């Protein structure tokens, strides 16, 4: 054992133990195209084996922000990895991508093999849900940079789409229908405000049980994993019914829906056309947040918004229903008369 490194606060043996523990989790993410296993200097993937004619690679990277601090407070680390995968694969799925492979990066103050196994197990769970292989990663023990009980998590996703099937919103037109896919909760954005409103202002803890939340512990509600939409979207992409997709993350409806809409057009959203999850009512009251501002911060119960030609609305809704995916008609595309590209009615 390298004593000098150990004396500096880095445990090489603990690093070996983490690799040993996570191998079985990585193995269950294997998918066609993967070449070899973990342990090399890079992850290998054979794109040609998938049979794409004009493949375009689509990549994304993200983390889970201060949701990690809620995981720490609740001492629950087995789902935060799902969030990390979801944030990345949902972004690339919004462009029509089939996720291929994923890499993670974990930085920590002290290498705790049992805890890090929980984190990576969650990453593997997310990869399985997304049909993405976990082909590599990095665990960096950084004493002095982080406290011993702190860690950070980031992910990197690469997917592929046929060049002709990339979803970029360019064909969105006035009259198109907006369909929303429900979220599972707060997902992984806005947690600095979540913590301030619930823990500082309202005085709640992760163990607080609220009637508004069905008596469930607040920490469990907040740590509900971000929904992965890959399997919900795949049949729609194959049918060619989707013109644009907005992943509702940081910035909520107000900032994310306009990202898919061409200049001169706007999304007109009819409030009340979908059920807003109770956690958002709790947040609004606890933080004394203006109701309209909530839509500029949180997903408000909708994690993905799809733009669909009205002639294919029923087809899209049937494809979702056949896949047991709930969906709501939220509104439509209109001319932009406000310069904001979005109107909440």
UniProtKB/Swiss-Prot annotation:
Give the CC-aspect GO terms: cytosol
> What Pfam families does this protein's entry cite?
AIRS, AIRS_C
User: Which pathway is recorded for this entry?
Assistant: Purine metabolism; IMP biosynthesis via de novo pathway; 5-amino-1-(5-phospho-D-ribosyl)imidazole from N(2)-formyl-N(1)-(5-phospho-D-ribosyl)glycinamide: step 2/2
**Does the keyword Zinc-finger feature in the UniProt annotation?**
no
What is one process in the GO biological process aspect for this record? adenine biosynthetic process
Judging by the UniProt lineage, the source's domain of life is Bacteria
Protein name from the UniProt record: Phosphoribosylformylglycinamidine cyclo-ligase
Please give the family membership noted in the entry.
Answer: Belongs to the AIR synthase family.
Among SUPFAM superfamilies, the record links this protein to: PurM C-terminal domain-like, PurM N-terminal domain-like
Its gene name is purM
Q: Name one GO molecular function term.
A: phosphoribosylamine-glycine ligase activity
Q: Which NCBIfam families match?
A: purM
Q: What is its EC number?
A: 6.3.3.1
* Subcellular localization, as worded in the UniProt entry: Cytoplasm
Name the chemical reaction catalysed here: 2-formamido-N(1)-(5-O-phospho-beta-D-ribosyl)acetamidine + ATP = 5-amino-1-(5-phospho-beta-D-ribosyl)imidazole + ADP + phosphate + H(+)
Membrane-spanning segments: none
* InterPro entries named in the record: PurM-like_C_dom, PurM-like_C_sf, PurM-like_N, PurM-like_N_sf, PurM_cligase
